Amino acid sequence: MIDSVDPTKNFNPLWRAIFSGEHPELRRGRKMFRLMSPTAHDRCRLCYAGFDGFSAPVMRAIGRGQWLRNPHFCEKCESVLAQERGGAEIEIAMLYADVRGSTQLAAGMRPAEFAALMQRFFQTAIKIFTWTDAIVDKMVGDEVIGIYVPCLTGPDYRQRAVAAGLKLLRATGHADPAGPWLSIGVGVHSGETFMGSIGVEGGNYQFAALGDTMNLGARLVGAAKGGELIMSATVWNDVSGEISAEPRSLELKGYAERVTAYVARIQ
């Protein structure tokens, strides 16, 4: 029998302060690192430590070099967040992208060849996520997930998520006359999620985004055919004046009612 769960146990005021940019130590740190790295153009999105310019070697020496998984953050900020248990409920946009027909692809290739193809896909996705100010949430199997947090990405976080999805479709060759080098589908949704560091007491913890919003995003990408970006109505309302899309009524697993989504393709 599962014990009852207190939903407030995982809430942490530090995470809320970080996501809002109002944490006092964060404000002091940003002021200090701006002074220490006056020539930096690329900075940690949390503490503002400079990743380039004349102070970059010093930043690396004190543990403020770029975190490899998410180049928008320094290694120190990542370690602090990983150790700070709990999180906060915040509004985000998420982008899911996964490979179409990966089982058949893997069956027709040597394991090393398939691994190289997935590596190319992940590298392409991460580069686009970096350009559009996303957090790389997960790279699992044949799927990659990017998270767009307003306090880090800006008020146009939904538009950036859609732009990233379209860039990824183009980068994988879906606009090429010869066809894509890898067929993928993309799903974009937005809403409130729980974001923070979760895991087992005394065991491993990881940074994660959880909730029904994430589940719906996963269902949307599952409904996308190769070359399609399927977005929820929430996202479409923000980008309808910028791109073309057609409505599609979807029957999604786990949802009692059909969901109206919008399908965009590379022109």
Per-segment meaning from a language model:
Residues 100, 192-193, 215, 234:
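Alpha-helix/helix-capping structural signal
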Residues 41, 45, 71, 75, ...:
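Short amphipathic alpha-helical segments
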Residues 94, 185-186, 228, 261:
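A residue-level structural signature of the nucleotidyltransferase/glycosyltransferase Rossmann-like core
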Residues 84-163:
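Catalytic NTP-binding/metal-coordinating core of nucleotidyl cyclase/transferase enzymes
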Residues 1-90:
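Regulatory cytosolic signal-relay segments
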Residues 168-171, 175, 201, 219, ...:
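Conserved, well-folded catalytic cores of nucleic-acid-processing
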Residues 225-267:
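Cytosolic regulatory/linker segments at or just downstream of nucleotide-handling modules
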Residues 128-160, 171-212, 260:
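Catalytic core of nucleotidyl cyclases, primarily class III adenylyl/guanylyl cyclases
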